[in-house]
UniProtKB/Swiss-Prot annotation:
Keywords: Aminoacyl-tRNA synthetase, ATP-binding, Cytoplasm, Ligase, Metal-binding, Nucleotide-binding, Protein biosynthesis, Zinc. It catalyses: tRNA(Cys) + L-cysteine + ATP = L-cysteinyl-tRNA(Cys) + AMP + diphosphate. GO terms for biological process: cysteinyl-tRNA aminoacylation. ATP binds at K269. Monomer. InterPro entries: Cys-tRNA-ligase (IPR015803), Cys-tRNA-synt_Ia_DALR (IPR015273), Cys-tRNA/MSH_ligase (IPR024909), CysS_C (IPR056411), Rossmann-like_a/b/a_fold (IPR014729), tRNA-synt_1_cat_dom (IPR032678), tRNAsynth_Ia_anticodon-bd (IPR009080). One of its GO terms (cellular component) is cytosol. This is Cysteine--tRNA ligase. The keyword Repressor does not apply. Belongs to the class-I aminoacyl-tRNA synthetase family. The keyword Nucleotide-binding applies.
Amino acid sequence: MKLYNTLTRKKEEFKPIKEKNVGIYVCGPTVYNYIHVGNARPIVVFDTLRRYFIYKGYNVKFVSNFTDIDDKIINKAKDENIDFREITKKYIQAYLDNVSGLNFDEDDTIHPKATEYIDEMIKFVKTLEDKGAAYNVDGNVYFDITKAKDYGKLSKKNIDDLRAGARIDVNSEKKNPMDFALWKKRKEESEPAWESPWGMGRPGWHLECSVMSKTILGDTIDIHAGGEDLQFPHHENEIAQSETCTGAHFANYWLHNSMITVDKEKMSKSKNNFFLLKDIEKEFDLEVIRLWLLSVHYRNPIDFSHDTLVATKNSLDRLYTAKKFLNRILENSSEKEEKDDNIKTFREKFEQAMDDDINTADAISVLFDFIKYINKNYDENTSKNILLDAKKLMDDISYVLGILFKEDDDDLDSEIEELIEQRNAARKEKDFKKADEIRDKLLSMGIVLKDTRDGVIWERSN
């Protein structure tokens, strides 16, 4: 299995620290607002990575944090005149509701909150201070980037260029403009703060992830992941402070997903071109979002549009139709001792795609090729052994991709029947254009209509 390591800028064979065990840390949300579809990409991508490791027999320790203390949270609490913990509680629950719809494996996820690790953060900063890598200025503690070995090695940024390109820093407390806050002193009495050797204050954002990953996964972790926008300065600063503190290599593999675009521009709150999952969910099941996010390789940008989601929904319907067809013919299949070696070939192609840096786009193509093969070659006369092998492969691929997890798909049949009724009504009204459009929509879902003397019947296409 090869993964593209941002640190080395090449695909590398994955070698875990401990055989058949893997620790993964994914930077989670700052919980001050609802998550948008751009926030969903790392959730889906790295959950799929976790699922594939499990498929391959690994024990996985998966950590995704909540940043529950931050300037944005403090400002929102101030604006709404409520305690900051009410803000974080509300948006953590909203996040959990959304990721449940995305079929994120919540049960096997560790969700540390920054405020639960304050003591560990203070010890971490004290260690850096004792090593001469951090300095205190009137209650604010900064990391001195000149003390970090190879600063810029992840983002490939040169420290001298960074200094030259840095804006004139209004904070004259810093020794270098690129130094960053490890501990921030409280600005006013109403701000949340904790006691420390440097006075009342709170941790800096970069510090939080370093300490939580160290405490839960150890000084060196297998995989650190997140969106590519976190490469610099967040992940770069994590490396600097962690490796200076522990003297150990921080993470062996760095994985970064690319951005979501809208009309080829990055989706972001600052550009006001973002779409909240809770709003998208009013029209589309979040399983559609999951399949769409996996339809493009995670290191490539993916463009968001309503038309794309409609097409993805139709694709998902086709998959559910194939799943139901396979289950139905399995119930009536014959007990013959037969095998189909093509199933093994499809499995090998799926694994080949996933072993190549989690190429979910190719893996999905394999799945669609497989259901075409099922529709064309299998029926009630097919051996039960063959159909069980086919079902096992479909279930395994579905598990890894995190799709087709709904057992009751009566809703799909109801939708098909409703569309057929709409088509019948359109034909009675001689609105043949609308009737053809409905027929084409059903065809895109893998449903073929046949007009008979007894009425319209439908079946799955090949």
